[in-house]
Curated annotation (Swiss-Prot):
Its main location: cytoplasm. Residues 1-24 are annotated as: Disordered. This is Sorting nexin-17 homolog. CDD domains: FERM-like_C_SNX17, FERM_F1_SNX17, PX_SNX17_31.
Length: 540
């Protein structure tokens, strides 16, 4: 018997939507859905490599996701004499180069963690010091051990979410950057491409930069501002047009990175432009809203500062065609509002558009309705919209609601990164959807932001309560799910929590019952969507 999901794939239909009666059945199905243990191949398989990931909570906004890797090393020269050489280990976080750190500094960090957390940590030990100089083979073995140590360390909320880890990661980045000046200026672009320049320290973290921006723009409530907006790294959307400067005329950002508090935006931006610019496509910083439902945005329209900032982004999205198609009557109304600069009415008109408030991702390949299907992706309105084309070239949008996504994860086959989520296609029918994209980590963070907004709303929490809850949060709980079938001939890297079975810190039982508001996003293991179990009939 062919399942409804399989028929949907073969016929290219949209994911099922539900009537009011079906909603009740689906809700019951979702609440009773069991999570199957995720079985992974053994590490003896030479074609298989296991990576780790973790999400520590940002102390003021949404959960961070940290995936740490130490892929290689480099030889550096001592600053003191300019002659003596030493080996530095290149640390990458969330797929981006973070810094090059010498062994002694990493060892000091490990000793600090051991002292702070006493005997509770029983994961992989940090490699010991050696009396003699290491040969290349020994250096690589040490690198692998350092990688395993960090990947195990960040799996444990009590450790990874501690301010010491955040502070040390920030310090590694800053020390590695070797800035020539302590005080700098930083350009941040608002939603319409308008540039605001702030003065800051090279070492200022993302949170500090957000506070400076908040003050510069005249917002009185820092918590509310930081909760509703995020600092992103972006580049020009048109790959054929080199972008050496950003103006209000050419502003059409393609987000590449959601900056978190373990990094300094000035350093992250400078490093990205040193290492990753191609054909004149330089990265820049921009402020984007993190609001996924018009009902959340509506109360903000009583504050003139929020209205102005939201209007700038909405107007630019409209000009760039990101709200198309727009009905003729609403289109005329939007143009009229723009002509008389009626920002509040413009936003309220946007709230009537189903195409408003989306972040447009890069085109990618997906396996829905069949493998290798080109698609366009956008995140917003508490859902993911994938637009494919039929044989005649006609666009066919498929809508995936956030409340129907049970788990999501990131995997890697060879050099190909994929974002995968398990979706409730029909009653008791779940199916994995795979997107092959280099924006996988960004998509995970956006989906987490959407889930957090849903949970906050269901908990009837004020912004102040939400922020305080996150500030005092001590951990997340991650559940497992079934693994995806794969071609056995292809080596696959599944980002997995290696220590989840042993729980060296003995804290996971406590976190299982902790407030599920702070769901972990993990590119390491399948992530259970807590909004999935807290939904109401209106969400289905």
């Amino acid at each position: 018997m062919v399942s409804s999901a399989a028929m949907a794939r073969s016929n290219g239909d949209k994911p099922s939507t539900s009537s009011m009666e079906e909603d009740l059945e689906i809700e019951q199905s979702m609440r009773n859905a069991s999570i199957i243990d995720h079985q992974y191949e053994k590490e003896e398989n030479k074609n298989h490599r296991v990576l780790n990931a973790f999400d520590p909570a940002d102390k003021t906004t949404f959960s961070d996701m940290i995936h740490v890797d130490v892929p290689d090393t480099k030889t550096l020269v001592e600053r003191s004499d300019g002659i003596t050489k030493y080996t530095a280990y290149n640390i990458h976080i969330n797929g981006w180069y973070h810094g090059s750190v010498r062994f002694s500094h990493l060892y000091e960090f490990a000793e600090l963690i051991k002292q702070k957390f006493s005997q509770r940590y029983k994961g992989p030990e940090f490699p010991a010091k050696k009396l003699f100089k290491l040969d290349p083979k020994a250096i690589d073995e040490r690198r692998q051990k350092i990688t395993k140590y960090f990947q195990a360390l960040v799996q444990h909320p009590e450790v990874a979410r501690h301010y010491l880890v955040e502070k040390k990661l920030l310090g590694f980045q800053i020390d590695s950057f070797r800035a020539t000046s302590q005080y700098v200026t930083l350009d941040v672009f608002l939603g319409n491409g308008e540039k605001t320049t702030i003065k800051c320290l090279v070492s200022d973290s993302t949170l500090e930069i957000m506070k400076i921006i908040c003050e510069k723009l005249g917002f009185k409530n820092k918590d509310q501002f930081i909760y509703h907006f995020g600092l992103f790294m972006a580049k020009g959307r048109d790959p054929t047009n080199a972008c050496y400067s950003v103006t209000t005329e050419n502003f059409n950002p393609l987000l590449t990175r959601f900056l978190r508090n373990f990094e300094a935006p000035f350093v992250s931006l400078s490093t990205a432009n040193q290492k990753y610019n191609e054909n004149g496509h330089y990265h820049f910083l921009c402020l984007r809203k993190l609001i996924w439902d018009s009902r959340v945005e509506e109360p903000l329209l009583d504050d003139g500062n929020f209205v102005e900032l939201l209007y700038k982004q909405a107007m630019q999205d409209y000009k760039n065609g990101h709200m198309d198609p727009v009905k003729e009557d609403l289109d005329s109304k939007l143009k009229s509002c723009m002509a008389r600069n009626d920002s509040k009415m413009f936003l309220r008109t946007c709230h009537q558009l189903s195409t408003y408030s989306y972040e447009i991702m890069s085109p990618c390949s997906c396996d829905y309705p069949k493998p290798g299907t080109p698609c366009e992706i956008k995140f917003g309105r508490r859902q993911i919209i994938m637009t494919t084309r039929d044989e005649t070239g006609k666009p066919k949008p498929s809508i995936f609601r956030a409340t129907r996504i049970r788990v999501w994860r990131i995997t890697q086959v060879m050099d190909k990164i994929s974002f995968q989520f398990e979706y409730l296609m029909a009653k008791d029918t779940f199916e994995w959807i795979t997107l092959d994209t280099d924006q996988s980590i960004l998509m995970s963070l956006l989906l987490q932001s959407i889930g957090s907004e849903i949970l906050y709303e269901h908990n009837n929490m004020t912004i102040e309560q939400q922020v305080m809850k996150e500030k005092h949060s001590k951990g997340n709980y991650v559940e497992k799910s079934e693994k995806l079938p794969r071609d056995p001939k292809k080596p696959i890297i599944v980002l997995k929590n290696e220590v989840e079975d042993t729980d060296p810190l003995g804290v996971m039982e406590h976190y299982h019952n902790y407030n599920r508001m702070l769901t972990t996003i993990s590119d390491g293991i399948p992530q259970r969507n807590q909004a999935f179990t807290d939904i109401t009939n209106d969400d289905l």
